[in-house]
A protein has these predicted regions:
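Short small-residue beta-strand/loop micro-motif enriched in glycine and branched aliphatics
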Residues: 215-218, 269-272, 445-446
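Conserved, well-folded catalytic cores of nucleic-acid-processing
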Residues: 19, 187, 191, 209, ...
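Non-catalytic, mostly N-terminal accessory regions of nucleic-acid modification and defense proteins
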Residues: 1-234, 238-239, 298-307, 407-411, ...
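Alpha-helix initiation/capping motif
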Residues: 2, 174-177, 195-199, 224, ...
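Conserved S-adenosyl-L-methionine
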Residues: 221-323, 328-346, 357-358, 378-380, ...
Length: 541
């Protein structure tokens, strides 16, 4: 697929999203448009798989042509359902396919003028035949119900709960709501997501594009579900350094799941994806995102809970861990955690008002011996004292897990302008006697009000990390002894000197210039005085 075609698809989807924009704010209509796209994806995958089964069985008709009201049709449906639940994790009947519902919702729009006269109606939408709200709600419920008692039940549970089709935000009356939904379905139905071409991830890329667009319009709320793509790329490349395959990848604050999926793009294969997310709506988005990117329901395990207070994967150790936790979030810091294996060995807990190092401790606990992890933190985590200073010292002096500190530009995250950094940890370090410091804070491109890392900026960070090189005013490999001398303060300017000397001023030359200007001024004053005398007017000086 050409880049132009890809951009055209993305613009088409964003235009459809804007059909709902006037009715509600960005994060609300996000849930609807992404939900409808997801429903279309499920339906088309179902149809492709069912048609394949029919073809392999020697049948010449399509899944959508099966008559559900006949005994023979029911036999076909039951047989396909059994295989679909195993392969796809869910099932849709022919009448529940996206294209079928869209056609019903836009029945009169597609009919001829004579058809409309015969039906004795002058409305384009909202006749009895094309009222689809109730049917659509039942179908979304049926998708979930089809998984009950199967291995995929948890992955589909309440997946569409944020799509309230009876919300007055969609329209004041059922007829108005039906009209807007029918329009959205009709527009989506015209778009070819090319799902039959398994080499292309057209829809996955478009979904990520939309998530990013919604994040840019969501302000502070964006941080709940989205890490800018270029930052995700840096994190993903850091934790996959030297790896072609991963047994597992984990994100303890996974948001929409985009960061996990970005890691998968950097290697040939990821066996299993794990994540945890506090926000219920974002948790639903993460599961949709996984399924829509073709991650099989048996290979991802996303949980909804508070990661620090109620961790859901304590028995697991992961080969790669990435995270962009909420900056300096509050947590309970309950003293009972001093007997929790994640925190007990450090002797101190992160303060209740700043959970940054609590997330780091949690991640280190889950890191496999051959694993790598990268986490985004606010700059304060590099130098704040008290308990945080103690934990920082323990991680470096006792554990020697810290591999690199990377300073990022300010204002690259939606909703906050604070400068951030990436800490990279490894349990088995190839360079156990030093820590790499990179100052990439000045390397960015300005896009409207936001700063962004360009492809070149990303490549420079990653290559500097992988080559572990010192570059004037950009990076420095600091011996552990130097870090100890700085009392384990990791503030980057202590290690990377970015000071630019001002050009020396030639005082004698400046004095000569002033004298010359003064002489010129006197000559000009004489000239003006002579003009004033000729004009018989008073001189201005």
């Amino acid at each position: 697929m050409s880049e132009d075609h890809k951009k055209q698809l993305e613009q088409q989807l964003w235009n459809i999203a804007n059909t709902l924009r006037g009715k509600m704010n960005a994060d609300e209509f996000r849930d609807y448009i992404l939900g409808f796209i997801f429903y279309k994806y499920l339906a088309e995958k179902m149809e492709i798989y069912a048609n394949k089964i029919l073809k392999e069985g020697g049948d010449t008709f399509l899944f959508s042509e099966i008559d559900e009201n006949t005994a023979t049709g029911q036999e076909y449906i039951e047989a396909i359902k059994e295989e679909s639940l195993e392969k796809l994790g869910y099932f849709l009947k022919p009448s529940e396919l996206f294209s079928a519902v869209s056609k019903r919702g836009n029945h009169n729009e597609d009919s001829t003028e004579s058809d409309r006269v015969a039906e004795d109606t002058t409305e384009t939408y909202n006749t009895k035949d094309n009222f689809i709200l109730e049917d659509l709600q039942k179908i979304l419920n049926n998708i979930q119900n089809s998984t009950m008692g199967t291995d995929s039940e948890e992955d589909f549970e309440d997946l569409f709960e944020d799509m309230d089709l009876n919300s007055t935000k969609l329209g004041k009356s059922p007829e108005a709501r039906n009209e807007i939904i029918a329009k959205v379905l009709a527009h989506l139905d015209k778009i070819d997501f090319k799902l039959e071409n398994t080499e292309l991830d057209v829809l996955g890329d478009a979904y990520e594009y939309l998530i990013g667009k919604f994040a840019s319009g969501a302000g502070k709320k964006a941080g709940e579900f989205y890490t800018p793509q270029e930052v995700s790329t840096v994190l993903a490349k850091l934790v996959t350094t030297g790896k072609k395959k991963l047994k597992s990848v984990y994100d303890p604050t996974c948001g929409s799941g985009s960061l996990l999926l970005r890691v998968a793009k950097e290697v040939e294969e990821v066996n299993n994806f794990y994540g945890q997310e506090l926000n219920r709506t974002t948790y639903n988005l993460a599961r949709m995102n996984m399924i829509l990117h073709g991650v099989h329901y048996r290979t991802f395990d996303i949980k909804q809970e508070d990661t620090l207070e109620h961790p859901q994967h304590l028995e697991h150790r992961f080969e790669a861990i990435v995270a962009n936790p909420p900056f300096s979030a509050n947590w309970s810091a309950n003293q009972l955690f001093m007997s929790d294996d994640r925190f007990s060995q450090y002797g101190k807990l992160a303060p209740g008002s700043k959970a940054d190092f609590a997330f780091v401790q949690h991640m280190v606990h889950h890191l496999a011996e051959n694993g790598q992890m990268a986490v985004v933190l606010p700059h304060g985590a590099l130098f704040r004292g008290s308990a945080e200073g103690h934990i920082r010292k323990y991680l470096i002096e006792e554990k020697n897990f810290l591999d690199a500190v990377i300073g990022l530009p300010a204002n690259i995250f939606y909703g906050t302008s604070i400068p951030t950094c990436i800490l990279v940890f490894k349990k088995c370090r190839e360079n156990p006697n030093d820590i790499l410091f990179i100052d990439a804070s000045a390397d960015f491109e300005k896009v409207k009000t936001q700063n962004m890392l360009s492809d070149a900026n990303v490549a420079k960070i990653v290559s500097t990390y992988r080559e572990r090189k010192t570059e004037d005013k950009y990076s420095y490999v600091a011996p552990l002894s130097e870090v100890a001398e700085n009392d384990y303060n990791l503030n980057i300017p202590r290690y990377v000197d970015t000071f630019e000397e001002e050009e020396q001023i030639d005082i004698e030359n400046v004095a000569t210039q002033i004298e010359d200007l003064a002489a010129d001024l006197k000559e000009n004053e004489k000239l003006i005085a002579s003009f004033c005398k000729e004009l018989n007017i008073k001189t201005p000086f």
